[in-house]
């Protein structure tokens, strides 16, 4: 350990209406990755490396992805972040502090400390989709000049499962 396993294949969704713009059509190419780590600290380090990887990937595409704490939903786990791109065609309403776009991550090292600090920097700024939106917190933590309310598309999602899968398998 650690081990990274990748699951890449075409996926099909039997939905009445595709969700989240172009990323959730009836048929799409899913690229999943799973890390298997020795302990919780190493697993969080893997999580944070994926967090940075998403930011760097979209930056190379000249897109600003906003990391937002997300609900783990039916997939479960202890922690989750969605990466949202601002788009008029998006179905998610997003609320964020404009200063989040000023966080510089381009030269972030991949050691434990640097990655934890990076995630903490992003999490100091309010960023939520309509599912996690809290008007009182938004008003309290973001002054009017920095408020951004718009639409976005989910372009990535990471989960920290903890021992959700390894425990039942006695791994």
Describe the function of each predicted region:
Residues 1-171:
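TRNA-recognition modules of translation machinery and tRNA-sensing kinases, especially anticodon-binding
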